Amino acid sequence: MMKPATFFDIDRTLVVGTSLETCFLRTAQRRGVLGPAALLRNLWAGLQSLGLAPAPPEDRFPIPAGLAFTTRLRYAFLSGNKAYLRGLRWEACAVLAEAAFQEEVLPRLSAQGQEVVAAHRAAGRPVVLLTGTLDFLGEPLQRYLKASHLLAARPEVHDGILTGRLTEPHPYGERKREMLLQVAEERGFDLTASYAYADHHTDVPFLESVGHPVAVNPDSKLRQIAEERGWELVEW
């Protein structure tokens, strides 16, 4: 028998006003793990992928089509850009991610969001965290919330060293919908009875895949879409 599930975006949905990656960067800079060279590398990679700096095609990470100018810039220089990780050891990053969770994420974790997660778990609905953030950044939160699944960006690792690339397309926009549909098929989730929570208009494909979409702290575009479609709106 198929069963409903609950899907949560993380950044600015469960974590208020910021992202797991921003929290990680703050912690890494504070501890001297990431210096100016890493940030300049990220800047250069972003310029390359925007076509504003020379680079062979294989060195450019793809930017989703149809993004607004400011969203495109954010994607190019942070959310889709992992060049700053190049050369770091995976184990060290996992340890740093746990420190970032304790120091930066927990104080910003929505109390109401935690209550909603717990209520869905108590109702027997598996909780799936589906996020564009890196998997090792999401794992401490998955453990803390006792979520059943974490679907996240997977960094490429060679001999224990991060390359600054992802192994699969970045979970963003339409790609998040594809991942939701895939896990639903694999696990036998009834999407018409399932819930999804997200904050950004690029999450519309993700939200409209379930019977109970919820716009959380929505940006102006998502708020308008949610109001037009009669979706639930909440502020955490």
Task: Give names to the regions the model predicted.
Residues 25-26, 49-107, 111-118, 123-125:
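Short linear elements at protein peripheries
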